[in-house]
Curated annotation (Swiss-Prot):
It comes from the Bacteria. This is Release factor glutamine methyltransferase. The lineage of its organism: Bacteria, Pseudomonadati, Planctomycetota, Planctomycetia, Pirellulales. Its EC number is 2.1.1.297. It is an enzyme of class 2 (transferase). The gene is prmC. It comes from Rhodopirellula baltica (strain DSM 10527 / NCIMB 13988 / SH1). Pfam families: MTS (PF05175), PrmC_N (PF17827).
């Protein structure tokens, strides 16, 4: 948004209209929303406050900050990284370049975990949950916040990711019920440690699929949290094989995956022999997104 020599003031409305058009041309899927979030951040206000300020002219310092945010967003930086947080399951989750930005699709994993604990596993007085590849800790804190009697262990191989998860856990005052641990899948756990629910949003992108990801993902989010291997099922196969011994009797394994590998992943689970009631759950777009199963 260039400063012009005419006398037309850069009101909130004009800034939003210009930026929305700019982001639309850049291929943003939500250009108006992006513009509103960034302008609210630059002004230090809630997004809804913009709607009562359309005719106001932000201060020069705010416009300078906004222009920089717009420039970086135009280069592909995710909005969540620019403002430092993302709403997930009605919780504000801190994020940075070391963690994946929580996606709405992952809320279906949280919902499935909560449904299992409230339903079939409701007889367990203090349900235990393992979140593998916790990243920002979004899944772990969402489950813990929703189910006050639940104890959650959240693991990640990345120490920088765990730093962000620690901030989110402490910010939500969940340190007494969410334990963070550096671990490559199950390697860092106690040998006999078992859980009622194991859930994971693991790396599940194949190399060919990764190469086609938009710049905003490929160049700005951690490669190791996305890329699984040539087929995309490498980490999922490990989870299926190793979770059987880590689940309590009747425990539930819940995995987020790409719709492109949903069928083959379900087949792997069926061939494993350690699970029953294996089923896929669709996201709001109708794509098979969650693989859920009970220990046989």
């Amino acid at each position: 948004m260039a400063e012009t020599s005419n006398d037309t003031p850069w009101t909130v409305m004009r800034l939003l209209e210009w930026t929305t058009d700019f982001f639309r041309k850049k291929g943003s899927e939500s250009p108006r929303l992006d513009a509103e979030i960034l302008l609210a951040h630059a002004r230090g206000c809630q997004r809804i406050e913009l709607y009562t300020s359309f005719d106001k002219v932000p201060e020069e310092e705010q416009r300078v900050a906004f222009r920089e945010l717009v420039r970086r967003r135009g280069e592909g930086a995710p909005v969540a990284q620019l403002v430092g947080y993302r709403e997930f399951y009605s919780i504000s989750i801190r994020v940075d370049e070391n963690v994946l930005v929580p996606r709405p699709e992952t809320e279906h994993l949280v919902i499935e975990a909560i449904d299992q604990i409230k339903g079939r596993l409701s007889d367990r007085p203090s349900p235990t949950v393992l979140d593998i590849g916790t990243g920002s800790g979004a899944i772990a804190v969402a489950i813990a916040k929703s189910l006050p009697k639940t104890q959650v262990t959240a693991v990640d191989i990345s120490l920088t990711a765990l730093d962000i998860a620690k901030w989110n856990v402490e910010n939500l005052k969940l340190s007494d019920r969410v334990t963070l641990l550096q671990s490559d899948l199950f390697d860092g756990l106690e040998p006999d440690q078992t859980f009622d629910v194991i859930c994971s949003n693991p790396p599940y992108i194949s190399q060919s699929e990764y190469d086609e990801l938009p710049t905003t993902v490929r160049e700005f989010e951690p490669r190791g949290a996305l890329l699984s291997g040539p087929d995309g099922t490498e980490i999922i196969a490990r989870l299926l094989n190793d979770s059987v011994q880590r689940l309590n009797d009747g425990g539930q394994l819940i995995i987020e995956l790409s719709p492109m590998i949903a069928g083959v992943s379900k087949t792997l689970a069926e061939q494993n022999g350690g699970y029953k009631e294996i089923h896929l759950i669709k996201d709001l777009a109708g794509h098979e997104r969650i693989l859920s199963m009970q220990k046989a």
